[in-house]
Amino acid sequence: EMGIDFSTDFYNINHVNSLGARKYTDFLENYLCLNYNLPDHRDDATYSEWQTLAENYALTSDSSQVAVQNLIENANGAFEIAENIRNADDFTVWATLVNDERFTVITAGNCGFSTIDLKPQYISLLRQLNLCDIYGGDNYIKIVRNADVIGSNADGSCSATANIGHNQQTVPCTVDNNNSMAAIYIDGINYSCGNSSNINMVVFDNYHRTVVDTVYLYVEDGMIKIGRK
């Protein structure tokens, strides 16, 4: 009866967002007006604080609804991009798709290639992903969202941690390169391909808090290639 849509009107499992709140309060208002003879306290000095709250809400309501709608569109768009990421076999396509604020890319392992092994366009793609320091190391870790580094082992340690997701809706990510085997734990589960002689990469959907893809990289004829389990 309220018209609440579980796919668009909830902030989390227990709370509606501003779209759901408007539907709920509109329904409640109509129900009370139809079924009860309630006095109208608008412009009543005794309820002036309520009037102020209503006016403040009116000032921010439209912008809040637009922000929520944009968030929903971003999240829905992530589904389509995620499917394209999983189906991409060409690294140039794959790297372009994952370089998006809706995804976090976790990279770890042993990079067995250098810039001299790569054609220029692949060097450029790695730079765009903020992986320009990836070359030649056997203990590489970097956690990147939209080219922004949110975790790494720049101190030379064999592990790194970060919280990944959107706003306060995050999960823990721990990367461990001990024993020459890259492990990429997201919410306690290891999603790495586990290739000891390759760079391993995991793509995480920040909005839906799910793993989109897990791959490893290798070089062939100057081109970066994608491998999957």
Language-model features, listed with the residues they occupy:
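Short acidic-hydrophobic catalytic motif
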Residues: 69-229
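Extracellular glycan-modifying ectodomains
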Residues: 1-79
